[in-house]
């Protein structure tokens, strides 16, 4: 043992118990070599709770279960498995051969149990233990009273303890699993192909974001961790896969707050022979499908009720900003736009054009008003380098879905003109040279693919973490990511 490790009194006692187990010839960290478990705690309640005490006594139902000890009170022990808790009853007289090991058990130990199902005088389902075995010894005590882990930072840092101490946390991640499963079901039933595309990209593209950089020694080449899956997925449309989607991790080297984590999970889907209207329809149908499958029609944000099954609203970005500022942003020059931005204390970067200012004012004035599901359309071309233009070529066929003031989805009629796409990339490169670190680079391999012909298409990206936040009514993205990114702990 490292002499520099300071142990608490409880930790010392538990290590002394290890020696006692050793003296009894019992391994404390063993391989599983028993008859396999045949039930989980929640199944016990579902299958047998309707039986009376006398009926259970007559049936003599034999069960095998395993779990972590949460409490010990006299002859009663409560264990927790993956699906819940169950009470055990230990009659020391019937376990005479195991009395020494029984006395060495601690809260936090993981045990294997064979027993007979019964009900107590109070009617609580309980397993009367016929045999038990210690599978794993807990050397560090759980938080006091097994629900004392309340420090938020510590909960995220030690998620394994959070899951033990706060059973409701596990429900969040079951919901997350179900959401991803329902997304797959939605697209699989429409004959979309699920694919996997590279995480290492030599050229930035698919979004405006700062990347994480890495280096491949064998290739002597620098790479970026992907900031989106868009460009390789659109290459697959060129290749004749007309309906395609990817669920995967995205990495963006940006700030951390309640809605942003540097690595997150997204779903991007692309459909040939479609457009923005079809993408909005698909997105609305997807969210309603998930809500129905999970039995959720309405969710609450503090005192506001959000109806996920009502028709989603639509507003135009430029019209909304014009109405809020009382300035016609469809007919305005850059100098006037800068003047209006100044009124609202918007910082104007040197690469800004009118479209950038419209977007900044939208984020400042409009986003906070979007509570019910709302599609925002008509984004300026300056902030939409991959979207097709609308009839007014200053704006694009793009939409974002906002719910409860947050963006949940981003969708386009995809730009399939390789010549226009090159001009857009070149404009992005000029922005990068003027200080926009998030601007896209010129991806020659993507342009080459477009020159073979990208069919008219629509595409959409949805942040799964935020969607789970919405459906579980959580305020922070860290609550729905098992191991969120945290600052290094100061020792």
UniProtKB/Swiss-Prot annotation:
PANTHER family: LYSINE--TRNA LIGASE, CHLOROPLASTIC_MITOCHONDRIAL (PTHR42918:SF15), LYSYL-TRNA SYNTHETASE (PTHR42918). This is Lysine--tRNA ligase 1. One of its GO terms (biological process) is lysyl-tRNA aminoacylation. Its main location: cytoplasm. Binds 3 Mg(2+) ions per subunit. Mg(2+) 1 binds at residues 400, 407. Gene3D superfamilies: Bira Bifunctional Protein, Domain 2, Nucleic acid-binding proteins. The gene is lysS1. Keywords: Aminoacyl-tRNA synthetase, ATP-binding, Cytoplasm, Ligase, Magnesium, Metal-binding, Nucleotide-binding, Protein biosynthesis. One of its GO terms (cellular component) is cytosol. It is found in: Cytoplasm. It comes from Mycoplasmopsis pulmonis (strain UAB CTIP) (Mycoplasma pulmonis). The keyword Cytoplasm applies.
């Amino acid at each position: 043992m490292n002499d520099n490790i300071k142990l608490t009194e409880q930790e010392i006692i538990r290590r002394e118990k290890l020696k006692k187990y050793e003296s009894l010839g019992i391994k404390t960290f063993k391989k599983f070599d028993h008859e396999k478990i045949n039930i989980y705690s929640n199944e016990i309640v579902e299958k047998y709770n309707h039986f009376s005490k006398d009926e259970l006594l007559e049936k003599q139902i034999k069960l095998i279960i395993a779990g972590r000890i949460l409490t010990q009170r006299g002859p009663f022990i409560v264990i927790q498995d993956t699906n819940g808790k169950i009470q055990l009853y230990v009659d020391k007289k019937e376990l005479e051969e195991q009395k020494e090991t029984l006395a060495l058990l601690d809260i936090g130990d993981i045990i294997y149990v064979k027993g007979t199902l019964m009900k107590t005088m109070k009617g609580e389902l309980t397993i009367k233990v016929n045999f038990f075995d210690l599978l794993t010894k807990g050397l560090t005590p759980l938080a006091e009273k097994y629900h004392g882990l309340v420090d938020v930072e510590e909960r995220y840092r030690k998620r394994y303890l959070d899951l033990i101490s706060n059973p409701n946390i596990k429900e969040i991640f079951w919901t997350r699993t179900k959401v991803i499963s329902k997304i797959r079901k939605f697209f699989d039933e429409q004959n979309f192909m699920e694919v996997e595309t590279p995480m290492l990209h030599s050229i930035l593209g698919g979004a405006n974001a700062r990347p994480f950089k890495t280096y491949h020694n064998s290739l002597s080449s620098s790479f970026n961790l992907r900031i989106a899956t868009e460009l390789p997925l659109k290459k697959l449309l060129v290749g004749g896969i007309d309906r395609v989607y990817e669920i995967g991790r995205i990495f963006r080297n940006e700030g951390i707050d309640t809605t942003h984590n540097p690595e997150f999970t997204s779903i991007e889907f692309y459909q040939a022979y479609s457009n923005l209207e079809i993408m909005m329809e698909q997105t609305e149908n997807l969210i309603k499908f998930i809500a129905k499958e999970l039995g959720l029609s309405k969710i609450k944000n503090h005192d506001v009720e959000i109806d996920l099954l009502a028709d989603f609203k639509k507003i135009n970005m430029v019209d909304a900003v014009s109405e809020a500022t009382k300035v016609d942003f469809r007919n305005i020059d850059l100098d006037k736009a800068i003047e209006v931005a100044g009124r609202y204390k918007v910082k104007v970067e040197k690469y800004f054009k009118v479209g950038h200012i419209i977007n900044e004012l939208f984020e400042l004035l409009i986003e906070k008003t979007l509570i019910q599901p709302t599609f925002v359309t008509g984004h300026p071309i300056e902030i939409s380098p991959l979207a097709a233009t609308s009839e007014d070529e200053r704006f694009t066929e793009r939409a974002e879905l906002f719910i409860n003031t947050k963006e949940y989805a981003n969708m386009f009629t995809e730009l399939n003109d390789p010549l226009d796409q090159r001009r857009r990339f070149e404009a992005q490169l000029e922005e990068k040279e003027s200080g926009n670190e998030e601007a896209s680079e010129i991806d020659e391999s993507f342009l080459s693919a477009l020159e073979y012909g990208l069919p008219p298409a629509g595409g959409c990206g949805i942040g799964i973490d935020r969607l789970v936040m919405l459906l579980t009514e959580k305020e922070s993205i860290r609550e729905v990511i098992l191991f969120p990114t945290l600052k290094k702990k100061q020792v």
